A protein has these predicted regions:
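Residue-level hotspots within the lipid-embedded alpha helices of multi-pass solute transporters
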Residues: 34-38, 72, 112, 116, ...
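Transmembrane alpha-helix boundary and packing residues in multipass membrane permease domains
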Residues: 30, 34, 46, 83, ...
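Helix-terminus/linker motif at the lipid-water interface of multi-pass membrane proteins
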Residues: 39-58, 127-134, 190-196, 257-287, ...
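N-terminal transmembrane alpha-helices
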Residues: 14-52, 65-80, 84, 88, ...
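Small-residue-rich hydrophobic transmembrane alpha-helices
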Residues: 57-117, 154-173, 282-339, 343-345, ...
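Membrane-helix interface/capping residues of multi-pass secondary transporters
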Residues: 45, 54-57, 94, 123, ...
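Transmembrane helical elements of multi-pass membrane transporters/channels
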Residues: 25-44, 146, 180, 209-213, ...
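Short alpha-helical transmembrane segments in multi-pass integral membrane proteins
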Residues: 1-27, 85-152, 183, 194-250, ...
Length: 452
């Protein structure tokens, strides 16, 4: 059944078409795109682990906070712009939606240049602060230098791709991501194994592949046949629109900033109790967990235009129906991830490296870290639901609660309780997941009663 591959001629079907059909049409392309992207990251780590060595995996893991910051700024602009444009389309205000597109374009360029330049200048100092040692610093430095030189390309691709998905073209957004991942995998294998460029080759492949994806996205928005596209007379920044984009996009921004901060604390904790290899083990677990989490993110990206449009049109029954269906699917997906990780941890982590010490640390950590995966699925959907309806403050509070209110204190206390050491770091993750889930459920029940 291929109806989800057919481009929507108008986003206004979001208030009339069956919800199940809409979720398939919007979510499946996003899920495929996010899953394939995550699979690329996994395969890239496998290439690095087998083609370079276990310390290279640790070096790559040290770059996660910086990569989270890149994603933080990209998603603040892209997701914020996508949500605002969906709401304007729900109100039948196509001109405002077009203004949002142009503002996203300019913001991505400015933010990409500023972030890339500043980070590149202080790169070594930043990486040492993140926990790099003499053994891992060269790998982390070589990777990030290339990524930062192509930073504007990353910002534009991620930001505009989000808007394309939200304005009625989920299948094109999926194809742009698939194109990027396909090119990335081919180039990474060539650069690492044939040319011998090491971790620098993996980063070069990433930027070149995103350049291909960006050309695809720009071709769409320069076409007058696209429902929302670049037009003369709109190439200027509107303060109100910029403020709205930053406000709604603040939730994913803070999620990623907090994730970066947490990863810094986690990396330092693992370095204290297990050395450089423990950081690499966390990097492997992070890649595996992210694979399933990206499926849920893709699901919520498909939910976002449906919920945002119908909320703007005041069709609250359709909003609730969509939310309940998405939560059910998310819990089911994360349950599958939990079962696979609990039953086959050694086989899963063994794909990344032949190093027995690294695999032992990663397999034991994986079984603990994903213990409450099903609850994470529901919590992520609820948080993104509030973002989709423009309730940025609620979404931000729920995001911060998980990262700062629950996880951070646990990271500082559990390792010292009963000599838990490295296991205290691992156990802080599922415990914070339970607390974050309870907070999200209570908040959702309160809000649904409010709009009944």
């Amino acid at each position: 059944m291929l109806f989800f591959m057919v481009a929507s001629k108008s986003p206004h079907i979001l208030e009339t078409a069956p919800i199940g059909k809409l979720l398939l049409q919007y979510s499946i392309p996003a899920i495929i795109a996010m899953t394939v992207t995550s699979l690329y990251n996994i395969i890239d780590s496998i290439f690095i682990g087998h083609g370079i060595g276990p310390l290279a995996i640790s070096g790559l893991a040290l770059t996660f906070p910086l990569m989270n910051l890149v994603i933080a700024f990209c998603t603040q602009i892209g997701v914020g712009g996508a949500a605002i444009s969906s709401i304007y389309l729900g109100r039948k205000d196509d001109n405002k939606a077009t203004e949002v597109l142009h503002n996203v374009l300019f913001l991505c360029i400015v933010a990409g240049i500023c972030f890339g330049s500043l980070t590149y200048y202080f790169l070594d100092e930043i990486l040492i602060f993140l926990g790099a040692s003499e053994a891992t610093l060269p790998y982390a430095r070589d990777f990030m230098k290339v990524i930062l030189m192509g930073n504007v390309i990353s910002f534009l691709f991620i930001g505009l791709n989000n808007v394309m998905r939200a304005t009625g073209y989920p299948q094109k957004a999926m194809l742009s991501s698939l194109l990027t991942v396909g090119v990335n995998l081919v180039l990474a294998s060539i650069f690492i194994f044939y040319f011998g460029w090491g971790i620098r080759g993996a980063a070069t492949a990433t930027i070149l592949s995103q350049t291909c994806g960006l050309f695809w996205v720009l071709k769409h928005f320069f076409s007058s046949s696209s429902y929302i596209h670049f037009k003369r007379g709109y190439y200027y920044l509107r303060i109100k629109i910029v403020a709205a984009i930053f406000s709604v996009g603040m939730a994913p921004f803070l999620i990623n900033v907090c994730a970066a901060a947490i990863v810094i604390v986690v990396n330092h904790s693992f370095k204290t109790y297990g050395g450089d290899l423990a950081i690499g083990a966390y990097g492997i677990v992070n890649r595996i967990a992210t694979l399933f989490l990206m499926v849920i993110i893709g699901l919520t990206q498909g939910m976002q235009p449906i919920v945002g449009y119908n909320y703007g049109a005041e069709h609250f029954d359709r909003v609730r129906q969509t939310l309940h269906r998405v939560i059910g699917v998310a819990v089911s997906i994360m349950t599958i991830g939990w079962l696979l990780s609990e039953l086959f941890p050694i086989s899963i982590v063994g794909m990344f490296s032949d190093d027995a010490a690294l695999n032992g640390l990663a397999s034991s950590g994986l079984r603990i870290a994903i213990l409450c995966f099903p609850l994470v699925g529901a919590q992520v959907v609820i948080t993104n639901f509030f973002q989709s309806i423009g309730k940025a403050q609620i979404s931000i509070l729920l995001s911060l609660a998980r990262q700062l209110l629950f996880l951070l204190p646990l990271l500082y206390t559990l390792p010292y309780i009963a000599d838990w050491n490295i296991y205290g770091v691992w156990w802080s993750m599922p415990i914070s997941d339970v607390l974050a889930f309870l907070s999200a459920v209570f908040t959702l029940k309160w809000y649904l009663r409010k709009i009944s």
